[in-house]
């Protein structure tokens, strides 16, 4: 479903781009990304039911990389982590190329499930509480499973959620180190789960890197993309990346 070229060689000499050059032997080192056939068939079945057709397919970290960490800044050892609901997808850039992909099977739902248990609410209410927590008010109002309306301050809410945020940071930081071989020099967090309060700082602490080098990426970090006057948060990076990847013929048919 996708690939990333690490190095091109022409007659055993490293090249940035082979186009327009002549030689006797071409060598390409790349990382290929594969999905089980049943997963791909399931994706096609879902789109068929909506009356849509698949134009192209790619891997989410590849798509996000294309707009957040383009080739000109991949000399830096950067980790990109797309924290969704059920999984956290990881891509590692180093020495001018994308060198590794990984996935942690924990993400934003871990925090939602912790909220369910601690506040006696259903899952949808837990999601609503997370959304309220990212807003401008100082308190969060919710209705528990007994039908009682409750109010809690943001400070108390964040304190009660901090163990699950810390646990999520543990798993992600370990997966990043396993993929990279060590802590990266910097990290971009994208996806809805990346907005969890305190997650960026927790990851910086666990990886031993400066807090200023772990950023939650949104519109301001998108390269070579004009989204007009729209204010796009980190949850939009991957969808925009998928569109860019498809339009620039970097995806798979």
Regions found by a protein language model. Give the residues of each.
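Phosphate-binding glycine-rich/basic clefts of nucleotide- and phosphate-handling proteins
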Residues: 32, 37-41, 45, 62, ...
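Nucleotide/phosphate-binding catalytic cleft detector across ATP-hydrolyzing
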Residues: 1-78, 135-140, 144-158, 179, ...
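Generic beta-strand/beta-sheet core signal
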Residues: 60, 83, 93, 190-192, ...
């Amino acid at each position: 479903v996708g690939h990333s070229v690490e190095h091109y060689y022409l007659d055993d000499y490293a090249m940035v781009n082979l186009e327009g050059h002549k030689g006797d032997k071409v060598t390409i080192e790349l990382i290929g990304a594969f999905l089980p056939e049943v997963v791909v068939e399931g994706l096609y079945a879902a789109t068929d039911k909506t009356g849509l057709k698949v134009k192209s397919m790619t891997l989410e970290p590849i798509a996000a990389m294309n707009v957040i960490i383009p080739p000109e800044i991949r000399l830096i050892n950067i980790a990109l982590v797309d924290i969704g609901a059920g999984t956290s997808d990881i891509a590692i850039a180093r020495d001018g190329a994308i060198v590794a992909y990984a996935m942690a099977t924990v993400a934003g739902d871990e925090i939602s499930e912790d909220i369910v248990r601690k506040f006696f609410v259903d899952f949808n209410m837990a999601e609503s509480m997370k959304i309220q927590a990212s807003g401008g008010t100082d308190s969060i109002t919710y209705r528990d499973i007994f039908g009682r309306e409750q109010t809690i301050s943001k400070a108390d809410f964040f304190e009660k959620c901090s163990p699950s945020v810390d646990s999520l940071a543990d798993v992600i930081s370990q997966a990043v180190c396993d993929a990279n071989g060590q802590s990266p020099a910097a990290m971009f967090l994208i996806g809805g789960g990346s907005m969890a309060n305190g997650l960026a700082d927790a990851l910086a602490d666990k990886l031993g890197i400066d807090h200023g080098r772990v950023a939650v990426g949104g519109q301001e970090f998108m390269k070579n993309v004009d989204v007009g006057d729209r204010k796009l948060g980190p949850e939009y990076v991957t969808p925009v990346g998928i569109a860019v990847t498809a339009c620039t013929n970097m995806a798979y048919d």
